[in-house]
Amino acid sequence: MIISLTLLILSLVALYIGAGWLVQGSSALALKAKISPLVVGLTIVAFGTSAPELVVSLNATLSGQGDIAIGNIVGSNIFNIGVILGVSATICPLQVKKQLLRIDIPVMLAATVLFTILFWNGTLGRTEGLFFLTGIIIYTIFSLFYSRKHGTEGPSQELEEQPKHWAVDTLAIVGGLVVLVFASRLLVDNAVSIAKELGVSEAVIGLTIVAAGTSMPELATSIVAAYKRKTDIAIGNIVGSNLFNILTIAGSCSLIHPIEAKNVNYIDLLVMLGISVLLLPLVKSGQKISRTEGFVLILFYVIYMFWLLRDTL
């Protein structure tokens, strides 16, 4: 078990590094194209930081481990809001822009409700997968057009101060993807091994260790953004990541191969839905998430973890 745990930790570190390269390269290219920072956070950064979840869930699906694939998606969405937004808000109250309130958060909630309904019986088929993927394509195109029409913010100061050739950014993207693919395979294999040795279900491993581990890029990105007072990136990253997790990851996995995950139950789905719904009144109160509200989100996650691990603690 020590070897499996060591390899799992190393795979998480590799996922973090690979996602970092991917985000750095893709964000630089997007900003050079004069896409606004908020939309970069909602799309490029969010999708890039969710790349670990994508490759891990795809690997798990192809290996017939649906509980890890779906547990990773559900657990990551809960972790993103409860821990990442919670911690970010305690560092700096998160101001919420109108686009997030009017468009992006409602779309995320709609996707979460839809996923909960469609996965209620513990399975996702190719029809649902195609529907989800169509949704993320429409959302991404809309966000990019909206940015072009309404966005006034140009490339970030950091990008202007440190110009790089597009080839360097492309190399970072390719290198990041290669690392992600190999690290994800290592993570899934050793997560399954640890689950068997501990006598816990693969769903619990997916909802906890795998979900938290694959969310490390989002955690780092949002915390750094909060410290720099770039709260639109911090929130946009999480909202975009949660959308990506449901529409792209669940969509891709179920389109490639129908998923069955009977051990991810309705309680887990309702917790994901509940913390997502809780986000709306929080951001509407003064159009920001305060430090107190950040602590509430963290507490929500801690209570869920105690319930989930009650039989193993």
Functional labels for PLM-detected ranges:
Residues 1-313:
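Hydrophobic alpha-helical segments, chiefly the membrane-spanning helices
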